Amino acid sequence: VETSVQRNPAVRAAIAPPKDRNKIRKEAFQLRKQLGLPRDASVDIVSLLELALPVIDPSFNLLPVPDKELSGRYAETRPYEHAIYVKESVYDAAIRGGGQARMILAHELAHYLYHSPREISFAYVNRNERLDSNVDPERQADIFAAEFLAPSGELRGLSVSDVQRKFGVSALAAKNQLRQASNIARRHASKKKRRSGPKA
């Protein structure tokens, strides 16, 4: 007799404590505030990881390594070593201001800060069913990276190219953040309309 597990093969997935986009956005803002970074300023992510984060966590190290040592990966966070390993090519691109490389480092920063081994669990899930996005650590790290580097609340009136240039993020991240900024503006307008009530 074929079981449901045989019909729907399971895959192993990492599970993080649930966080929605609003909570992650607040965490990104709080980190900027803790580091003394204005909300509308570009973040020098390399200097932050090499100089600022070790002040908060003296045991932390950003470790560029030859590309061949991270085959198939751009970077890897190892919380138990208090380190983020990054391909030299990605590190060099981030120093030059490459948007994707900067996003990769900010993504790994999120893993380091919020996804310690104590907080991550693993489960076998049905590969045909979508995992709740609020517990997906990769999605959480993607959102954090975008909100930390290009806060959605600071993008009013900007184009995709404006966001890329001002905040140093990839085109995809800029588009996604502008979409989030538009969603926030609509929600605020809707709340304001409800508070004002019907006009006489």
What do these predicted regions represent?
Residues 1-200:
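Active-site hotspot residues in diverse enzymes, especially metal/ion-binding acidic/histidine motifs
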